[in-house]
């Protein structure tokens, strides 16, 4: 229930409108470029905020744009799903799994700073996002 309260407050504070405007700019870049920009932007945002509220917020924004053709919209949904989930792996605060990992490391007295975590996680997160980018482009070719 808290998630919906956060989204409701963000909607009434016009935060969703501002983010929606920025997402619209990304989408306007074109079918392929815009989708990839959406993937990488949602990954970037997800690395510094929890991915579940981010996904819910972006879903609401994408759903509010009825003018997008269905095959392009499918690519956008995949971009948001992959970006918000995989981007959370970049930092120790981006997803529940990384928070758990950091907690376990602290419990076993394994020293790892925030920057150290990012340095070790970045290559894996970037590789995952590159694979997701290729996957989305292949799906886009199939849908078109």
Where are these regions (language model features)?
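Hydrophobic mid-bilayer segments of alpha-helices in multi-pass membrane transport proteins
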Residues: 1-5
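Juxtamembrane and boundary regions of transmembrane helices in multi-pass small-molecule transporters
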Residues: 82, 86-144
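Short hydrophobic alpha-helical membrane-anchoring segments
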Residues: 8-12, 47, 133-141
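Membrane-interfacial helix-loop connectors
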Residues: 9-110
